[in-house]
Amino acid sequence: DCIEFEKTIEILKTLTSAAIDMKLGAILEDEIVDQMPKWFNSNSRSHKILIQSTLGGTKTIELICKKFKVEFTLLGEEEKLVNGISEVVWNHTTLHMRSRDKNWTYLQMLLPLNNELELISFLRKKWGRKVLWHLEAVSQQGSPRLAALPVLRWNGINELNEIMEDCKKLGAFIFNPHVLTVEGGGLGVVDADQVKAKLKFDPK
């Protein structure tokens, strides 16, 4: 649990560079946490840093949390839990939000390296609570990076495009889930293998 959103990013980046076998790393902004299932958000209203690692990594995670003066909670072994954190990350986050309000949608993006907070701060100032932040630790060519699956309040295609342009100008690489074409989804080019897969799996 962390009161300051800016600190959550610093903590997650510290964890991704530590000697931890980390299977999952994510951040959920407090207003997203409020919309998650009761088993997850009943203890406190704060931003959450979610980490899934091998048992050997838990001590290092706890020490890093102590260094940053944030509360550390060990949930236990994932396969033994009735509810695990994998149920509130990845696309599950948006699905939980949309189950309460269909006006929420989302984007996917790779955040600019070392300028993640600059982008988020700009969008928070301009768009306020229309954009809520869900971040995930990813690996790009072997290097730790932060990706975002922000949850957006839908207010039409023009506003969506403006938000995406703001992100691009600040260095984010957008994967737009609202388009039907392969080239519109992020790569910007037509990839033959992706087109074949799209023809195979798209509804007929």
Model-derived features with residue positions:
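C-terminal substrate-binding/cap subdomain adjacent to the FAD-binding core in PCMH-type
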Residues: 1-90
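Conserved glycine-rich FAD pyrophosphate-binding loop
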Residues: 30-31, 41-43, 65-204
